[in-house]
């Protein structure tokens, strides 16, 4: 059922923008309101602004204004950086992985979440990266105790939306290495980036 829903572009765009809306909520501290209200306000603002930003990238891709090799290199770098950051349990991992999730659906990939062998890998990597993110003990020392409920709400929302772009990033990672074109690279045959017609 989840694979069926992910086959629709609108559903993928919605997940990407929702995850990216939670990415920078800690950097906004100028609002004179509760943490929960501030987080919801930032989510709405990021959702609207990044929706227009993503459509601009989609417009450039359809008009062939950007070379496919540029998107290929960008996508590879984002996969590597987000995977390492999440696996190491970094505190800012939700920022990078959310950017990855918002970028991938608009880079023209025709094979998105279609690898059958990727789901066991998702479960293993998600379980290994969940412990350092969910068991952080420094959150209660940073914030005042009067807003403990709001703080817990924000921490849980950040960690929850960390795993959504992480799954998307690992899906693209597995999909890339399972593609037949990658077998030619392993056999030391030269391949030009323009041959990656599947981008």
Curated annotation (Swiss-Prot):
Annotated membrane topology: Multi-pass membrane protein
Location of this chain's protein in the cell: Membrane
Signal peptide annotation: none
Chief location category: membrane
CC terms in the record's Gene Ontology section: membrane
UniProt keyword terms in alphabetical order: Membrane, Transmembrane, Transmembrane helix
Disulfide bonds: none
Record-annotated membrane-spanning stretches: 40-60, 86-106, 117-137, 166-186
Other comments on record: Completely overlaps MET28.
Protein name, as recorded: Putative uncharacterized protein YIR017W-A
UniProt organism field: Saccharomyces cerevisiae (strain ATCC 204508 / S288c)
């Amino acid at each position: 059922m989840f694979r069926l829903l992910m086959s629709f572009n609108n559903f993928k765009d919605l997940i990407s923008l929702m995850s990216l809306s939670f990415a920078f909520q800690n950097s906004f501290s100028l609002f004179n309101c509760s943490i929960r209200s501030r987080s919801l306000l930032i989510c709405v603002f990021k959702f609207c602004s990044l929706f227009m930003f993503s459509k601009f990238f989609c417009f450039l891709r359809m008009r062939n204004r950007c070379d496919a090799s540029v998107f290929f290199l960008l996508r590879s770098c984002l996969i590597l950086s987000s995977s390492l950051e999440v696996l190491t349990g970094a505190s800012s991992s939700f920022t990078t992985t959310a950017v990855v999730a918002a970028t991938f659906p608009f880079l023209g990939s025709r094979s998105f979440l279609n690898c059958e062998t990727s789901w066991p890998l998702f479960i293993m990597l998600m379980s290994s990266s969940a412990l350092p993110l969910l068991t952080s003990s420094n959150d209660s020392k940073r914030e005042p105790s009067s807003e403990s409920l709001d703080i817990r709400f924000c921490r849980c929302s950040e960690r929850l939306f960390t795993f959504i772009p992480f799954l998307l990033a690992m899906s693209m990672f597995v999909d890339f290495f399972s593609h037949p074109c990658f077998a030619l690279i392993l056999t030391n045959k030269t391949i030009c980036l323009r041959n990656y017609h599947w981008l």
